[in-house]
């Protein structure tokens, strides 16, 4: 992809929309995407125009490249990553046999974080449906304790995996890169209950 912006003072083209938004402090709706087969031409007088130089082919974006490598601050990428996490919920529930009470949800920093939030929203929706079903099964006059037991259920999430930024910087500068690379990620001790989670 390529994105462009023009005003009275500047014309700019970049591979990612958020770079233009941040550098020039402009909103996303003022930035245009260059379409397949188009070229952005600027003459010596500074007049800008788009020209169709090739016949557009079928667009076949690589979903992995788009979701994983794209800048996460782009509004469309953010929505797609959240939706990806939400769409994982049925498979996750199947994998854990719907045992959310003994499951702690987390993510590997950094790219997966946004998908993680989408997954949590999907899990919250699932749990709310379960709560409604359980309350309805109690009948018309449930006790305070019965309601409290059902309503207190939560999706458990922790920041289990962390990135050791200091070690990552050290590895990038040092000669023992291969030996230390496995330790760039660490766990947050105490975030899980051994034998239970």
Protein language model regions, located:
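N-terminal segments that mediate ammonia production and transfer
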Residues: 1-195
């Amino acid at each position: 992809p390529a994105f462009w912006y023009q005003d009275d003072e500047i014309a700019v083209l970049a591979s990612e929309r958020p770079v233009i938004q941040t550098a020039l402090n402009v909103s996303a709706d003022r930035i245009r995407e260059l379409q397949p087969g188009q070229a952005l031409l600027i003459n010596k007088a500074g007049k800008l125009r788009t020209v169709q130089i090739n016949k557009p082919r079928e667009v076949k974006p690589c979903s992995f490249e788009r979701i994983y490598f794209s800048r996460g601050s782009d509004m469309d990428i953010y929505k797609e990553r959240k939706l990806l996490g939400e769409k994982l919920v049925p498979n996750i529930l199947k994998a854990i046999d719907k045992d959310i009470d003994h499951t702690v949800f987390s993510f590997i920093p950094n790219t997966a974080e946004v998908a993680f939030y989408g997954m949590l929203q999907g899990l919250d929706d699932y749990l709310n449906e379960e709560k409604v079903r359980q309350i309805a099964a109690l009948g018309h006059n449930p006790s305070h304790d019965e309601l409290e037991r059902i309503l207190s259920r939560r999706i458990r999430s922790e920041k289990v995996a962390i990135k050791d930024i200091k070690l990552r910087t050290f590895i990038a500068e040092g000669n023992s890169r291969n030996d230390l690379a496995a330790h760039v990620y660490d766990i947050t001790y105490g975030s899980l209950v051994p034998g239970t989670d």
